From Swiss-Prot:
This protein binds specifically to 23S rRNA; its binding is stimulated by other ribosomal proteins, e.g. L4, L17, and L20. It is important during the early stages of 50S assembly. It makes multiple contacts with different domains of the 23S rRNA in the assembled 50S subunit and ribosome. The globular domain of the protein is located near the polypeptide exit tunnel on the outside of the subunit, while an extended beta-hairpin is found that lines the wall of the exit tunnel in the center of the 70S ribosome. It comes from Fervidobacterium nodosum (strain ATCC 35602 / DSM 5306 / Rt17-B1). The gene is rplV. This is Large ribosomal subunit protein uL22. Keywords: Ribonucleoprotein, Ribosomal protein, RNA-binding, rRNA-binding. Belongs to the universal ribosomal protein uL22 family. PROSITE patterns: RIBOSOMAL_L22.
Length: 147
C-alpha cells in the first residue's frame, strides 16, 4: 500500500515524487523518450531494441527503417522523439548522438476469453509494453569524464 504525500495541496504518491526527482537529475548531455501502454508484446519488442543499443542514431534509424517487424516502427518513433528532445530542449547536435540505453518493460495485460469445447474457456493475455530510449551526446559525455 502506497503512502500519500501532501505537497502544495495535491495528493501524490511516492512514485510520482521519486520520478520527478530522477527526471531532474538527468545529465545535460542526455535525453530520453518513453512510449507507454504500447500494444505489442515485450518479448517481440526486445528483439528490436537489442539491435540498436549502443549504435549511432543515424545507424539505428537505418536499422529500424528497413526492418520488417512491427516493433521497429514503434521504436523508430520513440527514437525520433528522443532525438527531438535532445536537439530542441538541450541544444545537442544530432550527429554526435548515440543510443546509450534502451529497454522494454512490461505494461498491464488485457485479459480476453477464448471459448473452447465442452463449455470451457481459456484466458488470453494481450500484453502491453513501456518502451524507453535514452540518447547521449558522445562528445559532451567525454568532456565531463575528462574533468
Amino acid at each position: 500500500m502506497q503512502t500519500i504525500i501532501k505537497r502544495e495541496g495535491l495528493k501524490r504518491s511516492k512514485f510520482h515524487a521519486k520520478r520527478k526527482e530522477t527526471l531532474a537529475t538527468l545529465p545535460k548531455y542526455e535525453a530520453r523518450a518513453v512510449a507507454r501502454f504500447v500494444r505489442i508484446s515485450p518479448r517481440k519488442a526486445r528483439s528490436v531494441i537489442n539491435s540498436i543499443r549502443g549504435k549511432n542514431v543515424s545507424e539505428a534509424f537505418n536499422l529500424l527503417e528497413f526492418s520488417s517487424k512491427k516493433a521497429a516502427r514503434i521504436v523508430y518513433n520513440v527514437l525520433k522523439s528522443a532525438v527531438a528532445n535532445a536537439t530542441n530542449n538541450l541544444g545537442l547536435s544530432e550527429e554526435n548522438l548515440y543510443v546509450a540505453a534502451c529497454y522494454v518493460n512490461d505494461g498491464p495485460r488485457m485479459k480476453r476469453v477464448w471459448p473452447r469445447g465442452r463449455g470451457r474457456a481459456d484466458i488470453i493475455q494481450k500484453r502491453m509494453s513501456h518502451i524507453t530510449v535514452i540518447v547521449r551526446d558522445r562528445e559532451k559525455e567525454n568532456e565531463t569524464k575528462a574533468k
